[in-house]
Amino acid sequence: MPAIAFLRVACPAVLLLAVSASTAWAQANDAAFEQWVDLYAQRMPKRAEDCTPQVLEPFKKAADMVESWAAFLARFEGVSEGADVLARIDRLLAAKQRIDELLDEGFAMRGQFIEGNIDKDRIRVWLGVMSNLIDLSGRLKLQLSESVNYAAFRVASDATLRERLVDLCIRRNSEVGAAVVGVLILPPPPQAPQDLPPVSDATKLRIMELIAAAGERSQLPRLAQLIRDPETPMELVVHAVDTIRKIGLPQDLRPEDVGNDEVDPPVITADEVFGLLEGVPPTRLDAKTAELRKELLEWLDYRRKHGLEGNSYRLGHFDVQPGDWLLMRNPSPYNLFTDLHPGLFTHVGVATIEKGSDGKRRMVIVDLPERGSRIPAENVEAYISDTLHFAFLRHPNPEYAKIMGDRAAAIIGNDSSFDLNFRTDRVLDLKNKPLDGVAIKTYCAGLLLLCAQETPLPRQRFFPIPETARGGNTAENMQKLGLSIGKDFISPTGCLFSPELIIAGRVTPLYEPTREVEEMVFDHFSYGLENKIFTPSPDLYQSLRVKLAEAAEQNPVLAEALRKKENIGREMDLVAAAKTQAVVETLDEVAYGHSDLFTMARFAVTCGDLDRLPGLGYSSEQVEQFRMLRQRHQDLYERFLKGTLMARDLRVALVKYYGEQGKEELDRRFFREQ
């Protein structure tokens, strides 16, 4: 049965090839795209004092226009010559580069907000600006990926133009370009046209240099395939291994994860790379490449036997070190709970070195998840594999960084309980105390404080902005959930304003429309908590679970059985956990259910003849659901058939529709009129 995940990947490319012209856009001023990019940059606040409420709406309007024009240019309407296709690609690459520069400039402003009096109104405006920048960068990245793929297809049969496309990607140091032209390092697949001009080894080397410079880890599978191919020229094998080293050779699985079907194995291991490179005769290489081979073999030999040699792990275009704080951004129901919103990051972890039972040293992330009864650790590259946007913060003092890394390492495997009251006082009680066997009860950001408080610096140097629950009815409604914002609360976003921490590394954001639907639902829940009366409506199973948790308060045997079944720590309040879980399950059902409907609706509009789908493996039930969704969106479908609907416009319309549907369902479930 075809998976929803496949549909999410397949639809954008289908739309790009299927959507044709619209006359209104075709007659517009060709320079409007760059003009809107410039206007977007002009409207961005440059200083903290510029962050006034009047900034946001014009800024968001400019972002919408930048994205709209990018989508229009990506249709390549009236562009027939390959050289003109490349000229348009260069415009899109330049715009993406400029937006990412603005994002860097925005993050550089973060320290200004703690100079003098702290003005949370200005901070919230800045957070709104940065959230918009992150979203726009991700949207343009998705659009650019489709556009560069199209350009690569258009110039595939012309060696000169193909080289120019590679040159464009190199000049712009484009990670999207690296991900697209990376396929050229491999032999053409059997189904490729036979008259395609061959790609020279020199071009393949340049592409590998681009992959390394951009830190494009998505190309690890292709690099692994290249060095496994016995037909690959030996010089290319050596340089492919060097490229893997530069973007980060995957670490071996932790011994605890070997044989666990839920943990994906690494794309390639140090041991396999060592064996493949050892099979390359140095006498068949020039002197410089032979010396590089020797250096790589020494590095790989140590790595396969002992793990990491030093105290850093290469992750794309930057290094991760022990004591670094990982900040992640994904859709979350907790993103708007505090007065420091919208949160730019929703979860955290701490990097540290772990020496496994096999004697190998690995860079891992330690975190405190909501579900689970022990502090987990996971290889850093695996931990961030599905994250839309993340950054690492670092204290530049190596001594302080080591203290924090050691503290994180000390609690791996300890009992844990997620504190639904988001308190930090239990963490304060652990200051300067050994942690062997100590149960950790806090929440994800509390883990940062657990590490930071061991340094000589006061707490305010790491978390300079006090946070409270969002206004209105938030605190009262949270109590009905079994939640509260504790005294001295800290959030994943709050540490971003620390004057002590630098941004050690950050990736450009990703965008996924299904995540946007989910975020709309989660954000509406937070809005409802602030402005409406929360009325929980658990289903029968959830009600019974709450009653069972209440009974377990007087029955230790039942309590222990419940904790094992629900995978929660010994210190967690069972009743509060049951109430919260009932709400979270409903939230997830609404958010993920509507994001899946978005995916199916987009496919229903764009997939063509529905009667051919059974032959492609779709069930009769799926086909009927697609037919129903096509009828629901008949107007969009007809516009798509006529060629008057842009890919972006279809996405925007469906995201809005299913986001609004999800919000209405939330109101029915939780915020019924009194």
Please provide the spans of the model-predicted regions.
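Bacterial N-terminal signal peptides that target proteins for export
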Residues: M1-C11
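Cysteine-nucleophile amide-bond enzymes
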Residues: A26-Q674
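Bacterial N-terminal signal peptides
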Residues: V9-S20
